[in-house]
Structures are given as C-alpha cells and as structure tokens.
Curated annotation (Swiss-Prot):
Organism the protein comes from: Rhodopseudomonas palustris (strain BisB5)
Thylakoid found in the keyword field: no
UniProt cross-references to InterPro entries, sorted A to Z: Asp/Orn_carbamoyltranf_P-bd, Asp/Orn_carbamoylTrfase, Asp/Orn_carbamoylTrfase_sf, Asp_carbamoyltransf, Asp_carbamoyltransf_Asp/Orn-bd
GO molecular function: amino acid binding; aspartate carbamoyltransferase activity
Binding site for carbamoyl phosphate: R66, T67, R116, H144, Q147, G272, P273
Pathway membership: Pyrimidine metabolism; UMP biosynthesis via de novo pathway; (S)-dihydroorotate from bicarbonate: step 2/3
Gene that encodes the chain: pyrB
Catalytic activity: carbamoyl phosphate + L-aspartate = N-carbamoyl-L-aspartate + phosphate + H(+)
Organism domain of life: Bacteria
Name recorded for this polypeptide: Aspartate carbamoyltransferase catalytic subunit
Family of the protein in this entry: Belongs to the aspartate/ornithine carbamoyltransferase superfamily. ATCase family.
Signal peptide bounds: none
Amino acid sequence: MTPALKSTFVLAHRHLLGIEGLSAADITGLLDLSEEYVELNRQVDKKRASLRGRTQVNLFFEASTRTQSSFEIAGKRLGADVMNMSVSSSSMRKGETLMDTAVTLNAMHPDILVVRHHASGAVELLARKVDGSVINAGDGAHEHPTQALLDALTIRRNKGRLEGLVVAICGDVMHSRVARSNILLLNTMGARVRVVAPSTLLPRGIERMGVEVARDMREGLDGADIVMMLRLQRERMNGSFVPSSQEYFHYFGLDQKKLAYAKPDALVMHPGPMNRGVEIDSIVADGAQSVIREQVEMGVAVRMAVLEALARNLPNA
C-alpha cells in the first residue's frame, strides 16, 4: 500500500496560470509536496488515487514532447482519466474559436484542463469560460509556471536552498516564457537573478523585473551558482536577432571555457529542447555539472504535486 503523504498543502487558487500571484509560502508548499512525489516515483508502485474519478484534459495548441508527456504521466499516476486533445484534428482547425472550444469542453465537465497556447494570455481567457481548474502549460512568451517550479526543485535539491543564490539566465530572454516565470519565482524566493544576452534578445525594461543585466558571458557568469541556458526561439522571431548560429555560439554559447567563469560547483540547467552547438556545447550539456536530465525527472513530480494541490480544492475532494 502506498503510504499517505505528509504534506497537507492545498493551493489556495482555483487555477495555476502563472508564478505571478503565488506567495513564497505557496511555492514552498508545492516544492515540499513535490519532494514526496520524487520519492514515490522512484518506487516500483508509483500510483496514488488522488485523482481517481477525475477527468484531466491536456489541450495543447503548440507541439510539445516533454511537457505534454510529463503531465500525462503525472495524471495517470494519480489515477485520473487523461485525455490528450489533438488540435491538428480538432474543430479549431475548421474555424472554431478558442472560446467556443472552451465552452464545448466545459459541457463535458472536465475537472482539470492543462493548456498550452501560442498566444500570451490565451490560457487565462480560457480559464474564465470553464468550471474546472486550469493549469498553464505555457502561453506564448508569457509564463510557464510548472517549468519554473521544477527548476526551483532541482536547484533546491542540489543546493539546499534558493535564497541568496546567484542565478544566471542566459540566451533568448526576450521570447522565453521560462525566463519570465523563473525570474518571478527566484525573486520571490530571495535569489539574485542575472540575465545574460545580446541587446537584441533582451526585452525593453527587463531591469524593472528586479534582475541584473549583463551583455557578455564573462560578466554574466562571474560568481554564478546556477547557469540556466535558453534556446533561440526562432519560431517566435519575425526578423533576424543574431547574425548566425555560429557567431551566437562563439559569444553566448556555453562551453567549458565560459563555464569556468562561474563558481566551480555551479549547476548547468536547460529547459529543453536543446540546440547543441548553438546555445550549449555537448561536453557541458552531458558533463558532471549538468542537471538537465534531473530537471526532466523533477518535472513529473512537480506536475503531480500541482495536480494534487489543485484537486484538493475541487468540489467533493
């Protein structure tokens, strides 16, 4: 028999639409609950019945491998009936609006909807039209809350804390929902955040988010405890932001020489998918300081914790 969870944390929100709005206590509660699921997922029997009788719909308007499969595994391990909705074969391809899709789905009474959409703010709009809980699995360049939570869990398990750490977020900050969610979370938890990118890949006024800004890797990685690399999101670019991939790697790609600017025990992170030889070298990505594979493992645990914490708030829970 699977032992009862020690954590009784309940997320005091109906939806998880972003890190913005979460308190330090909310984040700590989710991370503590996630820790229990890390241990459960390493056992032979990985099942719990927290979501038995509940319906979870994964609605992805953008292609995804890691996030969608991670949410599917998380839901099934909690006992939910999980449905993956293929947008390519859905009514939206035939002209149905996002709001019509939301109303149609709501008529089927799903308990939890996990939604990814290419437009910033689309997930929040959909959440207004449904009765169940909605989890933002990434909306445009806006937010990706579960990625920030799994990154925080990975850091905390390796460093023992978040407060006071120097975290360098490097690469295409302008188009990255991962960067935005991580900045919000890390600032809330007392870390020191530094963004490192060429000027063309930095949002205007990024300093107002409470970050330091560096425009070269030597300055940006100096004294860093965590080096978080971001890929070039060419699918969101409507022009040329870098001269070439080769030149970008020369100045901003993470290799062993640039990693040496950081602390000797710095962790290397990447949300995936990686473009080896563009933003990160294979030797570093697969090296002893890399926790990239661990991030994937933490993703399932975090998404189980989020589903559990929201389910505890559902009617008849």
